[in-house]
């Protein structure tokens, strides 16, 4: 059973809507957005190559990304940690330095949290409260036929960074005298270790007067996110491989790892890019076509259809969530 199916099972009969955040009417035309993210050592991060300051920053950033995915603005955060006695007070100071740095960058007030003892590694949970005008909230559902499918930034680079770190880790474990050489990989490493929520895109869309018809963030790969929007809106979509934004460093890492590793596979199934995937009405085309950092990658098809990708050879491929915790059961 995948993550989404498990959540649906556990929340059956509750008010949960299956979006990136819970939504509560705050009155005065505002909605409150509530989200929680948990990162577990050995599952979501590896302390062999994760600086604690980066980890603290990332934990807050990925929670803020959920707020961005609903077109909102983050306001307050709470951070809770469970740690074993192998972490010193100085180490936790470093972790919280990253937490505070991310909060300061995105004008979020750190208002509380909790600490607990862990018998194994570290667990960090971040809850963020945000706000959005009721007229501007964007859900995963809402896409309609002929809407444009758009994404921000580039895709697959975070996974490329993970591949580099795992390669160096394996080499180091085989030879402890080995000194990792990470020169030339700065971009993909930062994309994995220190992602940035795309609040800048939320701002650009607002300034242009564009409210997406549906939106989510790309946390488990483009294919998974497309399936989320398609399933929620009950619509299909068609995206074009040649339009997927992939950085040259991602392509370089793929060629180094294996001749059979394709950059498009990293984009579709890599995850942790935390870019925004959204749909807009065709009437907004002129407003977004030249907008820096936004790429039109396809369009919404008909009700009941599935997401597909068209290759440069004009072959149509049905998209499936290949990664761990995909949308499928």
Descriptions of predicted regions:
Residues 179-228:
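Polyanion-binding loop/helix "lid" in catalytic or ligand-binding cores
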Residues 39, 75-168, 299:
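Glycine-rich anion-binding loops of enzyme active sites
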């Amino acid at each position: 059973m995948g993550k989404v199916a498990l959540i649906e099972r556990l929340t059956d009969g509750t008010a949960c809507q299956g979006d990136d955040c819970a939504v509560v009417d705050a009155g005065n035309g505002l909605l409150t957005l509530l989200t929680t993210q948990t990162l577990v050592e050995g599952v979501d991060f590896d302390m062999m190559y994760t600086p604690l300051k980066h980890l603290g920053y990332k934990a807050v950033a990925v929670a803020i990304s959920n707020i961005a995915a609903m077109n909102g603005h983050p306001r307050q955060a709470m951070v809770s940690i469970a740690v074993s006695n192998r972490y010193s007070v100085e180490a936790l100071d470093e972790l919280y330095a990253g937490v505070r740095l991310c909060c300061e960058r995105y004008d979020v007030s750190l208002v509380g949290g909790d600490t607990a003892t862990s018998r194994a590694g570290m667990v960090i949970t971040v809850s963020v409260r945000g706000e959005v005008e009721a007229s501007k909230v964007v859900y995963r559902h809402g896409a309609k036929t002929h809407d444009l499918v758009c994404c921000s930034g580039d895709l697959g680079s975070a996974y490329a960074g993970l591949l580099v770190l795992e390669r160096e880790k394996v080499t180091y474990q085989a030879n402890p005298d080995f000194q990792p050489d990470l020169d030339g990989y700065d971009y993909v490493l930062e994309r994995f270790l220190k992602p940035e929520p795309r609040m800048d895109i939320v701002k650009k869309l607002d300034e242009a007067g564009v409210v997406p018809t549906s939106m989510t963030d790309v946390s488990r790969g483009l294919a998974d996110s497309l399936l989320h929007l398609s399933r929620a809106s009950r619509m299909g979509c068609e995206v074009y491989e040649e339009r997927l934004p992939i950085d040259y460093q991602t392509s370089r890492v793929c060629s180094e790892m294996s001749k059979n590793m394709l950059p498009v596979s990293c984009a579709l199934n890599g995850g942790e890019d935390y870019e925004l995937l959204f749909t807009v009405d065709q009437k907004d085309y002129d407003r977004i076509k030249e907008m820096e950092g936004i790429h039109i990658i396809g369009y919404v098809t008909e009700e009941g259809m599935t997401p597909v990708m068209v290759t440069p050879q004009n072959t149509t491929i049905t998209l499936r969530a290949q990664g761990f915790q995909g949308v499928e059961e």
